[in-house]
């Protein structure tokens, strides 16, 4: 969950080149960096390690999907400001323009001692340095009554793709004057302002086509990122439409029922016509399998993004954790 800048990857490429120069000479082959995860972090890392090393490093990107849909800008799609296709990207340019080796398979596990990534096909790829950018996994069990099955009725849409399309269809299809319930996640999680940006886009849709609709936010927190700005904006642009209820006020979500679309709290039982539940989160599973996590997240050395648990592994993006990342949820 640490912001990434190009200079970080330039430094990583330079550091990796230096660190691997001796082994590569000994074995008569280029040093190899394997990147797991083809999202924004992983794809950017693969690009600039390949580009800035000027061919001195063999770069392989392991990503199961052949097309990546961004979570950022998904709210613009939700609000009808962008077409769905515009947030999708392929990996053609990485391979053709920068010589990155693309492996479209699942990375199942990492053998740290042997420095190998084990793939879903049963094969493995060796590495000298490993970059993991696994994104997040959702802790469905963190909300009583929510589950992987319930996401088809109450989409989290916290991983882009079909979930975001489902959420948009439900928002647009909600009955006139109905109630939309949003349950944001507890800290820490991917993109602290994200749930409230999403509420804003949903309110934008309702203002156009369903102006008597209501939005209820049942928050597991007592404050949220950029709260003052959001509250001011909601009052200005969507007066009377959005109600934010803190954990202190509703007393906690005791249970949800995806069949009846009900949310039971100490304050009341809320009935939704459409809903989005975003559960608690943790680093993507491959980071756990690589043993670079401490609990739900992966501690890193902020200056280099090197995993604290393994000097040969770097962890990027939402899966990584540092003091700076924790502070981001408070501002």
What do the predicted segments below correspond to?
Residues 97, 101-109, 114-117, 125, ...:
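A Rossmann-like FAD-binding core segment of flavoenzymes
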Residues 324-331:
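Conserved small/polar residues in nucleotide/adenosyl-binding loops
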Residues 136-160, 267-303:
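Glycine-rich beta-alpha-beta "Rossmann" dinucleotide-binding loop(s) and their flanking helix/strand
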Residues 27-101, 186-227:
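Beta1-alpha1 glycine-rich phosphate/pyrophosphate-binding loop at the start
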Residues 130, 275-276, 314:
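AMP-binding/adenylate-forming core of the ANL superfamily
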Residues 1-20:
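N-terminal secretory signal peptides and thylakoid transit peptides that target proteins
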Residues 307-323:
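Short FAD-binding loop at a beta-strand-to-alpha-helix junction that anchors the flavin cofactor
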């Amino acid at each position: 969950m640490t912001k990434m800048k190009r200079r970080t990857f330039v430094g990583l490429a330079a550091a990796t080149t230096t660190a691997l120069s001796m082994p590569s000479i000994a074995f008569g082959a280029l040093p190899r960096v394997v990147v797991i995860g083809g999202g924004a972090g992983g794809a950017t890392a693969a690009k600039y390690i390949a580009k800035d090393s000027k061919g001195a490093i063999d770069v392989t990107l392991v990503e199961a999907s052949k097309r990546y849909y961004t979570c950022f800008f998904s709210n613009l799609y939700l609000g009808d400001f962008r077409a769905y296709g515009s947030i999708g990207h392929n990996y053609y340019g990485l391979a053709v323009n920068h010589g990155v080796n693309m492996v479209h398979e699942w990375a199942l596990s990492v053998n740290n001692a042997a420095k190998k990534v084990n793939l879903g096909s049963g094969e493995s790829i060796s590495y000298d340095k490993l970059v993991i950018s696994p994104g997040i996994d959702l802790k469905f069990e963190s909300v009583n009554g929510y589950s992987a099955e319930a996401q088809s009725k109450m989409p989290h849409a916290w991983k882009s793709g079909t979930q975001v399309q489902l959420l948009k269809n439900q928002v647009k299809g909600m009955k006139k004057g109905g109630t939309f319930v949003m349950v944001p996640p507890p800290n820490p999680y991917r993109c602290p302002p994200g749930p409230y940006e999403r509420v804003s886009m949903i309110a934008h849709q309702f203002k156009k086509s369903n102006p008597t609709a209501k939005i209820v936010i049942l928050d597991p927190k007592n404050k949220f990122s950029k709260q003052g700005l959001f509250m001011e904006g909601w009052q200005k642009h969507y007066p009377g439409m959005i109600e934010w209820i803190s954990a202190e006020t509703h007393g906690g979500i005791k249970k949800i029922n995806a069949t009846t679309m009900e949310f039971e709290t100490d304050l009341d039982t809320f009935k939704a016509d459409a809903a989005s539940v975003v559960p608690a989160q943790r680093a993507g599973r491959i980071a756990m399998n690589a043993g670079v996590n401490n609990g739900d997240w992966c501690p890193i050395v902020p200056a280099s993004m090197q995993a604290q648990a393994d000097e040969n592994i770097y962890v990027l993006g939402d899966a990584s954790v540092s003091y700076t990342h924790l502070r981001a949820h408070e501002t």
